[in-house]
């Protein structure tokens, strides 16, 4: 009997994946791993090397040259994890506006994604990790001990996204946010589905603390989960 050592969190856009992942990892003493940081690390390396973010061949070659690692925080400066590229701490450097501008372009190529997934899987194999991102339960960690797929109503997700934007001094009409999320949902319906054995968690009306408590009590520490070897 054991507590899940690998936890995969996927779900709809703005459903609260990162919030749940970070709080759950903190409660368990696990690594919180937002897989998007891998692509940010690659984008930073491309900027430094002068590589065009639209050049798939060059980006793929660069991705294979990089060793990207994500660990528990090594510095008490507010970070949730430490990101290393070939041994260099780039945790804050990958958050620059320059990286932000090109990361989605660098991440869209299949050959790049395959290499990033390979490196994500290496981190997942260590265990004691809560991994958050797209296709985590189906592609990156299909054998994860616990898979959670988050869903919430469009209205709830729009409200949360609006609050997040306001915290960054960005004011956007709720209707515009909802329309953008609906468009994203339509795109995701063709490319991103929950794993067959994922727990579908609808979190409308739940605070982050309530959601973490629910997951811990019902799916992590429950008698049934332990009896199943999870």
Swiss-Prot record:
One of its GO terms (biological process) is pyrimidine nucleotide metabolic process. ATP binds at residues 11-19. GO terms for molecular function: ATP binding; CMP kinase activity; dCMP kinase activity. Its EC number is 2.7.4.25. It is an enzyme of class 2 (transferase). Belongs to the cytidylate kinase family. Type 1 subfamily. It comes from Chloroflexus aggregans (strain MD-66 / DSM 9485). GO terms for cellular component: cytoplasm. Keywords: ATP-binding, Cytoplasm, Kinase, Nucleotide-binding, Transferase. HAMAP family: Cytidyl_kinase_type1. It comes from the Bacteria. Disulfide bonds: none annotated. It catalyses: CMP + ATP = CDP + ADP; dCMP + ATP = dCDP + ADP. It is found in: Cytoplasm. The keyword ATP-binding applies. This is Cytidylate kinase. InterPro entries: Cytidylate_kin, Cytidylate_kinase_dom, P-loop_NTPase.
């Amino acid at each position: 009997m054991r507590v899940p050592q690998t936890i995969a969190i996927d779900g709809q856009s703005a459903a609260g994946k990162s919030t749940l992942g970070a709080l759950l990892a903190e409660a368990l003493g696990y690594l919180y791993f937002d897989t998007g940081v891998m692509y940010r690390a690659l984008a930073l390396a491309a900027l430094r090397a002068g590589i065009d973010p639209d050049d798939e061949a060059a980006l793929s070659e660069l991705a294979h040259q990089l060793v990207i690692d994500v660990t528990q925080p090594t510095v008490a400066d507010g970070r949730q994890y430490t990101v290393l590229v070939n041994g260099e701490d780039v945790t804050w450097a990958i958050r620059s506006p320059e990286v932000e501008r090109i990361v989605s372009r660098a991440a869209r190529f299949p050959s790049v994604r395959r290499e990033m997934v390979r490196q994500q899987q290496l981190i997942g194999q260590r265990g004691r990790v809560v991994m958050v991102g797209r296709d985590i339960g189906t592609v990156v960690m299909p054998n994860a001990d616990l898979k959670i797929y988050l869903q919430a109503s469009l209205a709830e997700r729009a409200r949360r996204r609006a609050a997040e934007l306001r915290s960054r001094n960005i004011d956007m009409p709720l209707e515009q946010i909802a329309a953008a999320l609906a468009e994203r949902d339509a795109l995701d319906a063709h490319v991103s589905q929950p794993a067959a054995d994922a727990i579908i968690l609808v979190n409308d009306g739940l605070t982050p603390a309530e959601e973490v408590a629910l997951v811990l009590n019902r799916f992590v520490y429950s008698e049934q989960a332990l009896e199943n070897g999870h």
